[in-house]
Amino acid sequence: MAFGPAAMGYDRAITIFSPDGSLYQVDYAFEAVKKGWTTLGVKTKAGVVLIGEKRKATQLLDVDSIEKVFILDDHVGCSFAGLASDGRILIDYARSQALQHRLIYDEPINIDYLTKLVSDVKQMYTQHGGVRPFGVALIIGGIDRGKTPKLLMTEPSGQFMPYYAVAIGQGGYTATEYFEKNYREDLNMQDTILLGIRALASTLKPGEKLAPSNIEVGFADVDSGMFRKMSFEERASILQKL
C-alpha cells in the first residue's frame, strides 16, 4: 500500500482521520495481515476446522516448534495471520478470559462473547495516542452450547464477523476463491477438513506440495464439542486423501 504526499500528514498519528475517512495506521496493520502465512477456517453442520500454514524463512528454522493453531479452551481454538508477537499477546488474553469465565460461572465461555472481548482490545488500540494497532487477524472457531458450530474472524480495526469459510494471509484471496466455488454446508467432518486443506493447497506455487510438517490443523466436531489439534500422523494420513 502506498500513499501520496497529501496523505503523509495523516499517517503519523493513529487518532487522526484522513479527509476520506481512513485511519492509515489501521490500514497499514491490514497490510501486515496480508503478509502473514496463509490461515483459514471452515464451518459446516459437522463442526469447525482451522488450518495454519508454516513456512521456513531459512533452512535453519525448526518449524516443528512453531504453533499456528492454538487451543483457547476445551471447546474453542484459534489461528492467526500477521505479526506473531501480536497474535501471541491476544491469544494469551483470550485464554485468560476463557479460564476466568469458567472459574466464575462454571461453564464454557460463549464463543461470540470471547471474540468480542478480543476485538474490544483491538479496537482500543485504534483510538489512543502512543500505541499502534495490532497487526494481526485472528480466526476463532469452536462449538458453542447447543452443539452450535461457530467461526469468526477479528480484524485489526476491532471489527469481527461470523463466516462459513474465511481465509487470510498471503494466500487469502486465492483460498477464498476456492471456498466460493466448492463450499457446502452439509459436509461431514472429514470432508470439512479436506475442503480446508484443498483450499490451502490451491494457494501453493507450481511445484510446491503440502506436507504434515508445514501445516497445523485443529478441529471441533458437534458430537464431542471438543477442540483438538491433529497429530503429525493424522495430518500425514489426511494429506494422502488429496
From Swiss-Prot:
Instruction: Name the Pfam families for this protein.
Output: Proteasome, Proteasome_A_N
The annotated modulation of its activity is: The formation of the proteasomal ATPase PAN-20S proteasome complex, via the docking of the C-termini of PAN into the intersubunit pockets in the alpha-rings, triggers opening of the gate for substrate entry. Interconversion between the open-gate and close-gate conformations leads to a dynamic regulation of the 20S proteasome proteolysis activity.
Q: Which InterPro entries match?
A: Ntn_hydrolases_N, Proteasome_alpha, Proteasome_alpha-type, Proteasome_asu_arc, Proteasome_asu_N, Proteasome_sua/b
Q: Which residues form a coiled coil?
A: none
Primary location class: cytoplasm
Query: What GO cellular component entries does it have?
Result: cytoplasm; proteasome core complex, alpha-subunit complex
Q: Where in the cell is it found?
A: Cytoplasm
Q: Name one GO molecular function term.
A: threonine-type endopeptidase activity
Q: Name one GO biological process term.
A: proteasomal protein catabolic process
The protein's UniProt keywords, in alphabetical order, are:
Cytoplasm, Proteasome
Taxonomically, which superkingdom? Archaea
Family stated for the protein in its record: Belongs to the peptidase T1A family.
Looking up HAMAP family in the UniProt record yields: Proteasome_A_A
Q: What does this protein do?
A: Component of the proteasome core, a large protease complex with broad specificity involved in protein degradation.
Could you give the subunit structure recorded for this chain? The 20S proteasome core is composed of 14 alpha and 14 beta subunits that assemble into four stacked heptameric rings, resulting in a barrel-shaped structure. The two inner rings, each composed of seven catalytic beta subunits, are sandwiched by two outer rings, each composed of seven alpha subunits. The catalytic chamber with the active sites is on the inside of the barrel. Has a gated structure, the ends of the cylinder being occluded by the N-termini of the alpha-subunits. Is capped at one or both ends by the proteasome regulatory ATPase, PAN.
The record's listing under PANTHER family reads: PROTEASOME SUBUNIT ALPHA/BETA
Recorded protein name is Proteasome subunit alpha
Species the sequence originates in: Sulfurisphaera tokodaii (strain DSM 16993 / JCM 10545 / NBRC 100140 / 7) (Sulfolobus tokodaii)
